[in-house]
Amino acid sequence: MVKRFEDLTLQDDFMFCKVMQNPDLCKRLIEMILSDTIGKITYISIQHNINTYEQAKSVRFDVLVQTEDGKFYDVEMQVSNEKNIPKRMRFYQAAIDISFLDKGNFYNNLNDSFIIFICTFDAIGKNKPVYTFENICLEDKNTSLQDGTKKVIINAEAFKDTENKELKEFLEYLKTGKAKSEFTRRIEEMIQTVKQNEQARQEYRLMSTFEMDARYKGFSEGTYNNKCETAKLMKLKNFDIALIKEITGLPESEIEEL
């Protein structure tokens, strides 16, 4: 059953992505989670698709961000525990590396990347609000591999145990819908603004329709040909190229050639 547009919250992918399109809110959330400042955001892509090659499993990032210093941040909202987050994080990080290191470049040119999963449940099971993972030497815990990667899993269920006050209020808002801080009130205001936007409503309706059809036809695991057929139909109905790209995951250049 598709959730009504009026009932969407930050937990829902569609609304989360809409809110994260705001660079200020997106930057502040990342900094809050990492407890560190990041550079100026120069690129935000919502529902960003990466296809390494035709037969490979594709990746769709909720929010992919790049800052002026070249660092990448993937931010995911996760409400269902599919018990695969550690392996997904590994795959997502590899997809970023493969996609953004051009042929002929040196490995040292790989940009730092951060994979962040904001979960409404405890994915690790240790009752901690924040789990941060880096590669370290098992024989000498003080020695880091320094490969420029970091993975962070947030457990919103443990918001009461969160030491960072701002993060605690955000996680409480995520779980309860109660906006008590200036930051969460800004998020809630933006959500209400989105709900008043007729174009956003139509976009959600369209995406929901295609996703239901995709499940029925097996399109979620779908073939390249299915994606092309969907793109062709959408073009015939004069849908925007950017929306076709978002739904099918096909590159813009391929869509234009169809």
Residue ranges and their predicted role:
Residues 1-150, 160-162:
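Accessory alpha/beta interaction modules
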Residues 2-6, 10, 14, 66, ...:
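Short, charged alpha-helical interaction segments and adjacent helix-coil junctions
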Residues 148-173:
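Compact structured core domains
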